[in-house]
Amino acid sequence: MENEEKREYLAKSRSNSRNFLNDSIESKNIFGVDKKSEPNLKQSIDGGLNFSTTSSYNPSNLPRTSVFVSARNLSSTVGHGKNEKKILTDLNFFLKPGSMVLLLGSPGCGKTSLMNTLALLTSNEKITGNLLFNGKTGDPNTHHRHVSYVVQDDFHMAPLTVRDTFKFSADCQSGDKSEKERIEIVDNVLDFLDLKHVQNTVVGDEFLRGISGGQKKRVTIGVELVKESNLLLMDEPTNGLDSSISLEMLTKIKNKVQQEKMSCLISLLQPGLEITKLFDYLMIMNQGQMSYFGPMNQAIGYFEGLGFKFPKHHNPAEFFQEIVDEPELYCGIDDGSSDGGSGDSGSSSGGSNYNYNFKNKASSTMMMMNNNNKIIPPLKGSDEFAMAYRKSIIYKHILEYIDSHIPDEEERSKFIDYSTTLKPYSTGFGRQLSLNVKRGFKLFLGNKASIRLRLLKNVIIGFILGTLYWKLDTTQADGSNRSGLLFFSLLTFVFGGFGSISVFFDQRQVFYSERAWKYYNTITYFLSMIVTDLPMSIVEVLIFSNFVYWMTGLNKTWDRFIYFFLTCLVCDVMSLSIIRSVCSFTKTKYAASAISPAVVSPFILMCGYMKHSNEIPGWWIWLYWISPIHYGFEGLLLNEHSGLDYHCSPDELMPPSFLPTFNTSYPVGFEGNQVCPITKGEQILDSIGFHTEFYYRWVDLAIISAFTLLFWLITLVCMKFLVFRVYRKDPVGIKKSKPNKTTTLIKMNRNSTDSTTTNNSMNYFNNKHNKKQNDDSDSGEEMESVDVDVKSSGKANLRKDIPIGCYMQWKDLVYEVDVKKDGKNQRLRLLNGINGYVKPGMLVALMGPSGAGKSTLLDVLANRKTGGHTKGQILINGQERTKYFTRTSAYVEQMDILTPVSTVREVILFSAKNRLPNSVPIQEKEEFVDNILETLNLLKIQHSLIGDVESGLSLSQRKRVNMGIELASDPQLLFLDEPTSGLDSSAALKVMNLIKKIASSGRSVICTIHQPSTTIFKKFDHLLLLKRGGETVYFGPTGTNSKIVLNYFAERGLICDPFKNPADFILDVTEDIIEIIQPPQTLPTSTSNENNNNNNNNNNNNNNNNNNNNNNNNNNNNGNTSDTLNNNNKKNLESSLSSSSISFDPVESFKESKENQKLLSIVENSIMPVGTPVAVYHGKYSSTIKTQFIELLKRSWKGGIRRVDTIRTRVGRSFVLGLVIGTLFLRLDKEQNDVFNRISFLFFSLMFGGMAGLSIIPTVSTERGVFYREQASGMYRVWIYYLTFVLSDLPFVIITSYAYVIPVYFLTGLSLSNHGWDFFYHSFISVMLYLNFGLTSIAFATSLPVEEMAFLLNGVLLSVTSLFAGFMIPPPSMPAAWKWAFYLDFISYPLKAFLITEFKDMEFVCTDNKGAIPIPIPSQNTTKFFCPITHGTQVLDRIDYKISFQYWDILIMASFTFALLVGGYLSLKFIRYQNK
């Protein structure tokens, strides 16, 4: 936003506020309605608030584009019979063009379900009642054309820029507009959302750096606004935005709604007063039922009519949300003006001040109390509120209004045509395909790291193959090598397909969203995937083919090269189609990564190389015919061997000359005669069982293409009809846990001085020793106003020898990052000369607009920055920060990264056991955790699994669990980053009550917060306010009811409106351009000073009974006083608003202020009083190695066994494949062909182990985020974490291995000599192999930034290790330059061990000359058959395997295991991709 636009906007906002305040003061009601006069309810319903464009709604007068929504008895259920569950129950409401409806309710109340119902995006729900749009039911095929639905989740294509994201949405949803109009729409939305300056920045994700979280939320809004639809639905659109940006954005939306006559429903979590005033109607939901729907200006009066009391100057949105959840809070409220506490209550016309006092039974007929002196509210529970609303006059008028405004047939024609004549898609098929292809190429080109890696992979593998099979000859050995080379070429592309798993799942949620809104037909998106993949596939195959084909000396004709290229290309595309088809019908990437190898493995096995077609049993021959790889392999062999003549080198002639009977006369010997077994390439094809007709290669290519089309079709069908998740779940019907006595007391008895001792669970955070905290003598009364409550409690602090809080100060703090500008490396300063401090008992708020550096400063103070350059001084208890800092502090991150397979209690207890000193008994640690659970209201869900964001705990619960994990360390210094982000006002207040209590217990607390309500802001006693650029606008105490901070700005001519949230006001001050108002130097407050108010309040507390007895008189007097004060406020405010304005620099003003001078004098010296005890640490970690090892092992093991689906998939996959292999090679005999069969299936077992190892990558990626957080907190040693993770997975590795080995070993009839020892030896080698492959996957997953790269490199490694294992090309045939690769290949050693065990004592025969080579005897005019292999040692000698190395192989494999362990540990310890 430019300077002039900002000035104009601020002026306009100030003018609106001025007009609104004048009206409000005159009527003595913040919503502009005089409570003393009964308004015309029908007129309020018809006109709404601030909807002055039409005095009454007349459908025939509205433009054609308007949509009037009406709902009558709208209900929604899921399930059937006993499992039926109500989602929405008998909702009656309307959405009127030109008006905005605010939807409030706690998480799980049904807000998202209602939004989905209005958008016609329900799937399994049964909808009853009437839902009409302009009097007609919505057509699911065309309804989306008129609806813009902003969902909670920010699903975007990370590599796309902001402009490209908006442009794609506009192109797909506004096809009826010209290109120029669409560009203009995108430009307008970019300006509308203030995203113009980042329009060419990628959206990004956790691994691709892009725009900020708040900007990403605005992008989510923008992709719907470019649609320019008639019905606007927004589900919590302000999450992650600060209050000033939220207000600015919603004000613009309000203007847009009024100007364009849109119908609008918006759900919000913590709306401030200014935001609430923008809405015309209010809808409150609770457990799927409607507690209120009606005009905003009637809501307070409605609830007061039910017996509740709205506190004076309280935020209405908080009142509306809390009253249905915790009605006890608003029963029997003394709306006087006494001040009962520091910041929680008090009286001042300049802020939203209120005071909870309990009246006795005689003083109010509205309040009832039970025998335990607990307040009984007039209404409680969703059923009672819904029933009361249905009996209200408002409900009656709402129904009348809905029924009277359903248009007749004539009027319906003037509205949007909802008939099926409207096309579902705004663009044609060709246009959709063009847009998707264009975006696909942008996405592809945006992932440069993947492009480089894929190209490099093909260069490296192509070079390896070219040099390994350099200039193949036409000898017998090279004939076999040609077949092995061609088989491996296919494997290279098959394994490369695994890299697409993560990409598919990364983009699937975006596709689901766009498919639901009919951006395009599914087939166009599907075709665009194929089209955008094809160029890269062509380049990859071209590079690979040129290296392999010409370097190895394959059949050197251009037509055969072209066929080789085409076959490899089609096989590459086909393998990708197989993997994508698996991904399309699996729910998670965990399942896809486990199932994909199981699908691909039989196709590899049945291709004809490992098991010749003429040897496949009849019950599996169908698998041979449906294996697409078989046709690719057959085509390549036809292309290579057809017409090729082979010869024998002297040592390849049969029988060999060293045979004892070689020169013996017939019939004993061969009389010196020899033959060359294979002289024509067709002989090789015939021996395998392949076609020998040269033309058939094109048939094979056509069949591969047909299989590719089949897998494409499977993928398309699944993508079109399957949906695993589109929107966040909204679990209505789950009863919300009732606030415990402690929490209720904290909220209700805010002015009680002994509330600390009332709360047993909170007391646990108080110090056992009744010490009074010392204040710094130089701080002065204004600079130090912390009231530390450290009363003794019945429960001792865990660390009796350690102070409960600590002293932290920072001076001239500067933080810079390296950036590149104009091709030069420069440093960008994010923090500039920040000063401040925190003491025990202080709760400091870090505030500022987006980009001010709040989180950056918190990360610097908490020592969480992993990059950049920090300057300045940070002292902890007067000393430089040491490596033991993590033992003193705790950091609650904004992102709730938690272990999904652990329970709530387990994660908190885990933190306590690892972060509390080992000297604390286990029983005390568990009691400590119990009290944390009680304090955080988590007892009812303590044994619930955390789960993921979609199916696990709610956002509020996850926030509290995250806090509990850090509180379990019993920290002296607590950092919190946006602890209320994403919470509704009730949940946010609960969290802040806890944080305030923690600070009051004597701890030092620093907290960033971006959108605090008035009530929440008053919880903070100190404020550090930053502006964009990381400069200080204010540091100091806030004062009672924010008096000190507001007076600071008032002295500079900046007056906070009496009804404005002080937090919003001070954020406005941080704008680059601000206007100040002169000459007022103080706030327009009560004529009596605050000390008198405090004294009066104390007297009121001391004489509570007298006050209660005279309550009615006091209320009357308070009403007169309120009128007088409001008149004074109005005069002062009008005088100030009419004054002149000048420019103001908040940073320079603070630098020159006395507050800054006092701050500098404090931070110049140590703020810690002399003689204060300081904890002394002797180690970085609180717990011992033994404790860490046991706790980590327990957690990892529980996490493993709770991933039931993963275990079933891993074990089931191995067992099923074991049965397939076992029955395919059933009861192997000792014939000549069984020699190769034994070798091939043993080699395949190794390959399968490598593919099975891929399934652990998603798990490692998920756990890596948790590890980063815990490691930064200093919970445990890295090597213990890594070792226990591996050990906990070892049993599953063993089970998985045995699930494959047992059926294979006994079904195939492998050796059982030495009393079965060979079986156990084989099993042990298999377990070691599976373990090594798993360790390799872990190393890749921890050392690479994204899963795609981990899958891709795993495929490369599997290809290379398979190549050098000794099966594709025997060691004697390897060039000398590549022999080292054979010895470094960890697959070669288990293959060697398998073969030595199997062949060392085995004899082979040629029954009925089967497999024997006929040797002509010319002298006798006959033929004698030669059996090539009669003993297994011949096989071992031919491949140069020594029997004596059988057990050395185990040691070598163990050394590989150790090396992989070390490599994984080093990557986990030193490589970080979540940099701050």
Curated annotation (Swiss-Prot):
Membrane topology, record value: Multi-pass membrane protein
Gene3D superfamilies: P-loop containing nucleotide triphosphate hydrolases
Keywords: ATP-binding, Endocytosis, Membrane, Nucleotide-binding, Repeat, Transmembrane, Transmembrane helix, Transport
Boundaries of every ABC transmembrane type-2 domain copy: 445-722, 1201-1471
Record protein name field: ABC transporter G family member 18
Any one of the GO BP annotations: cell differentiation
Pfam family, one: ABC_tran
Extent of Low complexity compositional bias: 749-761, 1086-1141
Family per similarity comment: Belongs to the ABC transporter superfamily. ABCG family. PDR (TC 3.A.1.205) subfamily.
Biased composition, class Acidic residues, residue ranges: 776-786
Molecular functions (GO terms): ABC-type transporter activity; ATP binding; ATP hydrolysis activity
Role according to the record: Required for endocytosis and endosomal pH regulation.
Domain ABC transporter: 69-312, 814-1053
Entries under PROSITE patterns matching the protein: ABC_TRANSPORTER_1 (PS00211), ABC_TRANSPORTER_2 (PS50893)
Residues where ATP 2 binds: G848, P849, S850, G851, A852, G853, K854, S855
Major site of localization recorded for this protein: membrane
Top-level lineage group: Eukaryota
SMART domains: AAA
Consequences of knocking out this gene: Cells that have a abcG2-abcG18 disruption have an endocytosis rate roughly 70% that of wild-type (or rtoA disrupted cells). Disruption on abcG2-abcG18-rtoA cells have an endocytosis rate roughly 20% that of wild-type. The exocytosis rates of abcG2-abcG18 and abcG2-abcG18-rtoA disrupted cells are roughly that of wild-type; abcG2-abcG18 endosomes have an unusually high pH, whereas abcG2-abcG18-rtoA endosomes have an almost normal pH.
Entry GO CC: membrane
Membrane spanning stretches: 455-475, 485-505, 523-543, 561-581, 590-610, 618-638, 698-718, 1211-1228, 1239-1259, 1290-1310, 1324-1344, 1349-1369, 1448-1468
